[in-house]
């Protein structure tokens, strides 16, 4: 089983079926491997494939030219999500925080458009904003490379920004009923993958009512104004890549499949 069910977060009862039915779980997270091992499943930690794929394809200067980056401005990445309901709920908050930042620092903002979100939809929310905002297409890791800081919705994006060593604040909101049910069913301390990996908050999290423009500004502004504070966070998120292993996840999975299949075949022959 590769990319296994998240028994570490919820529905741990599923582990019994997995233990019964699978020959091997190829785990992408250390804490996931621990959860499956405790459940009695045969498990091997192989690492996350993103550890291999998250890297820029351009030099810094090439990326600056490609995205029309302004060297005289702080470049801030806004990542409101890949679903319309996420973008509708989070982008206005991010834009309000961006307005706050722009009043204190000379900033350039970038929104990488997810393939599921039409550009017209983003522009309808941005409206007639006076902010310097670029909506970008593709080369997301090159864009991360040139940015000073980021505000992102929860999900894989925060793992990607951590692997790119980009200081990020995670924001997310659910409908009140959904949030109530999530608190009943989900049993993890953090929402962000970097924090789950490290067992501590290296990527600040703002959830539900705390996900507001004032709080986002309070976290981002020190990173933008004080390079030493930004570097301190970078040193923390550098540990995320170390926690994910040395890369080569896909090759390890392939080797594991061959070895496991060989072992099973050998037992059958006996």
What kind of feature is each model-predicted range?
Residues 1-270:
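Nucleotide-activated sugar donor-binding and catalytic core shared by glycosyltransferases
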């Amino acid at each position: 089983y590769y990319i296994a069910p998240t028994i570490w977060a919820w529905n741990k009862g599923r582990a019994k079926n997995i233990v019964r039915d699978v020959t091997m779980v190829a785990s992408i997270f250390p804490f996931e491997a621990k959860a499956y091992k405790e459940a009695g499943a045969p498990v091997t930690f192989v690492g996350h494939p993103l550890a291999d794929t998250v890297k820029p394809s351009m030099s810094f200067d090439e990326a600056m030219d490609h995205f029309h980056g302004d060297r005289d401005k702080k470049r801030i990445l806004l990542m409101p999500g890949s679903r319309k309901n996420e973008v509708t709920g989070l982008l206005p908050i991010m834009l309000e925080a961006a307005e706050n930042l722009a009043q204190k620092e000379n900033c350039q903002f970038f929104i990488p458009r997810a393939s599921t979100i039409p550009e017209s939809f983003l522009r309808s929310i941005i409206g007639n904003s006076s902010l310097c905002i670029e909506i970008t297409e593709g080369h997301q890791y090159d864009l991360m490379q040139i940015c000073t800081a980021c505000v992102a919705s929860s999900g894989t994006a925060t793992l990607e920004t951590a692997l790119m060593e980009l200081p990020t604040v995670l924001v997310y909101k659910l409908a009140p009923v959904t949030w109530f049910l999530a608190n009943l069913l989900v049993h993890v301390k953090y929402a962000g993958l970097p924090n789950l990996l490290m067992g501590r908050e290296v990527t600040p999290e703002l959830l539900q009512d705390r996900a507001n423009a004032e709080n986002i500004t309070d976290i981002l502004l020190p990173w933008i104004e004080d390079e030493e504070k930004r570097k301190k966070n970078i040193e923390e998120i550098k540990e995320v890549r170390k926690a994910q292993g040395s890369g080569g996840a896909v090759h390890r999975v392939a080797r594991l499949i061959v070895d496991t299949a060989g072992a099973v075949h050998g037992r059958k022959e006996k």
